[in-house]
């Protein structure tokens, strides 16, 4: 009798473990899709400085080694862009971190935070960077051709 109970408990444990694993995979797939959707909202953003360009075209041409990612915090879904910009005048390469809070219902985003070499930028500094990126963007150049 003890052997049957033990086998039954092992089967129950295996079934519970399988359910937990499947649940984890489903959550992981959902998280990945939400992350990709949020990134696309920001990448497809437009700006009146150059209405033909998308945000990803402008930023990926203006900065080098750009990396787009997404995460969730208490405020919501954040899209993070990290990239570098060489300034020949001071012989320095700056690292920029741009974070945008995404409103998935309205397919919009707003500045969440921005940093230049780890120093917090204000909204005006981020806007200047965005204006320069869009102004210099050539919509006929793909990111891998820059």
For every predicted segment, state its role.
Residues 1-2:
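N-terminal hydrophobic targeting signals that begin at the initiator methionine
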Residues 5-9, 24-146:
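Cystatin/cathelin-like cysteine-protease inhibitor module
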Residues 11-25:
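Hydrophobic membrane-insertion alpha-helices, especially the h-region
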